[in-house]
A protein has these predicted regions:
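Glycine/small-residue-rich loop that forms an oxyanion/phosphate-binding "nest" at active or ligand-binding sites
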Residues: 13
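Glycine-rich phosphate-binding loop signature in dinucleotide/nucleotide-binding domains
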Residues: 4-10
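Mixed-charge interfacial surface used for oligomerization/domain docking
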Residues: 10, 19-41, 47-57, 61-143
Length: 143
């Protein structure tokens, strides 16, 4: 941050969701140090992929409009709460490996051809809906 602060007055750092990485916590601790007070602002993206990219594009637009990093932080945190990703999974294998479901649940789900729709919202990943077959997931657009 020291090199960036030689060129810029303020830094706005947007790491991926704190639920998925320790980058936010580390950056938050560093930003709280006296030398970075009111100079470095850290936003928990609460997501990854497209919603995180959208937050970054919004931040760039706000910078170009002349907003301060502190103002952008507030705006980004508010809009972050409205972003949701839905993902239809074709296999239960990764949920089993990640400990989200048991081996027996994965076995039964596979036998019944259950395909979960996952909801990723502000750092939380949950099973939103269960479908019978992947085509039902694709047809089910009213999440």
């Amino acid at each position: 941050w020291d090199k960036a602060l030689e060129k810029y007055e303020q830094i706005l750092y947007i790491p991926m969701s704190s639920a998925l990485s320790g980058a936010y916590s580390t950056a938050r601790c560093l930003a709280d140090e006296e030398e970075y007070k009111d100079k470095v602002f850290v936003v928990d993206a609460g997501s990854v992929s497209t919603p995180m990219h959208r937050l970054i594009l919004d931040a760039i637009e706000l910078i170009n409009e002349g907003y301060s990093a502190k103002e952008i932080l507030s705006i980004i945190e508010e809009s972050r709460e409205k972003m949701i990703i839905y993902i239809g999974l074709d296999t239960l294998e990764n949920l089993k490996r990640g400990g989200r479901i048991s081996g027996s649940s994965a076995l039964i789900g596979n036998v019944l051809n259950i395909k979960p729709v996952m909801k990723f919202s502000t750092g939380l990943l949950d099973i939103h809906k269960k479908c019978r077959g992947i085509s039902q997931c694709y047809q089910s657009r009213n999440f």
